[in-house]
Amino acid sequence: DYATINSQKGINNEHSLFLLVEGYRDASSKLLNELLTAEKVDWLKIDSLIYPILFSFRHYLELVIKDTIRNYNLIDKKINSDEIGFKKEHSILKLWTLLKNRIVENYEGYDKETIQQCEIENTSVENMLIEINNLDEFSFGFRYPFQIVDYGKNINSKIVYMFGELKIDLNNLNENMSKLINYFEGLNCQSVHILDEIQTVKE
């Protein structure tokens, strides 16, 4: 058995990013499901796996938002298919703001009730993203146990933990992860569909 990297690129150079989005999403979901379905509670395993679960899920969110932003930049002809399509930014909240400002343009043909429902859903999603962003704004929080102010240039820096004591309800985490996955997969699929329609007509 073997894995391949960049063996396919896709018409818009989207394939490798697609695989990363899928991979981090599935990795976080499968690890969490492993903990939730275990016959016996293993506290050491829970406390060790929570880090890769949260890191992978946070990175999934960052990637799926960036991928959707890139799709809309292709749709709006702001970029070509051989260009990256999103800025260097790790704050999920800042990325979400960029995406939200674009997706509201899709509401122009919606009726008032549908627009209100979309806005309610957006607010709910934003509140969850704020919570994640407050914990880990720049994608370091679940990669290291300590704050690395100078990126390890001084080995004698005093230890400062990333977080105080945290208790995480795994069932609640699973529920919120599912909500965010369903929401952002829907947004991403919508952007892919719009882009596909535009490029099909062009051909």
Please tell me what each predicted stretch does:
Residues 1-203:
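Domain-scale activation on soluble regions of proteins
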